[in-house]
UniProtKB/Swiss-Prot annotation:
Gene that encodes it: Ifnb1
Protein name: Interferon beta
Molecular function terms, GO-annotated: cytokine activity; type I interferon receptor binding
Signal peptide residue numbers: 1-21
InterPro entries named in the record: 4_helix_cytokine-like_core (IPR009079), Interferon_alpha/beta/delta (IPR000471)
């Protein structure tokens, strides 16, 4: 019976040190630096704007509210993964420099892998996050972005609308990183 309590205490000790092991200050710095790089790359993707192609994809309002630190990290990871998937689509009609798009994809991939590694130890919280309404709204939002591109046959005007939307995403991610402060 005593061994059982010792085992419970050991598990609690193990989980509490795991929970404290994420350095949120470092995570904040890393994310801000990487998002700035992505914004700079996105700004280099030029094209013509046609206001008739405007769309409101309705980003979930929860994304602008304060969340607990680990949920913020999961939200950022979800956003980066989906932005990566958006830019993997057929962008050939845009006339964009393929090298810049590849660099953007590489930067997004590196950030996603970094966050996945950092958050690996938070599997229980990940399950809770994935079932949350915020996560579901976020998935639905990116589905609307993908659907818009597909309906518009990936034309250059639609891509410029999506480019502007993704730029807003990066601004939201930068704002979310403030949650990593004490």
């Amino acid at each position: 019976m005593n061994n059982r309590w010792i085992l419970h205490a050991a598990f609690l000790l193990c989980f509490s040190t795991t929970a404290l092991s994420i350095n949120y200050k470092q995570l904040q710095l890393q994310e801000r630096t990487n998002i700035r790089k992505c914004q700079e790359l996105l700004e280099q993707l030029n094209g013509k704007i046609n206001l008739t192609y405007r769309a409101d994809f309705k980003i979930p309002m929860e994304m602008t509210e304060k969340m607990q630190k680990s949920y913020t990290a999961f939200a950022i990871q979800e956003m980066l993964q989906n932005v990566f998937l958006v830019f993997r689509n057929n962008f050939s009609s845009t006339g964009w420099n393929e090298t810049i798009v590849v660099r953007l994809l590489d930067e997004l991939h590196q950030q996603t892998v970094f966050l996945k590694t950092v958050l690996e130890e938070k599997q229980e919280e990940r399950l809770t996050w994935e079932m949350s309404s915020t996560a579901l709204h976020l998935k639905s939002y990116y589905w609307r972005v993908q659907r818009y591109l597909k309906l518009m046959k990936y034309n250059s005007y639609a891509w410029m609308v999506v480019r502007a939307e993704i730029f807003r995403n990066f601004l939201i991610i930068r704002r979310l990183t403030r949650n990593f402060q004490n």
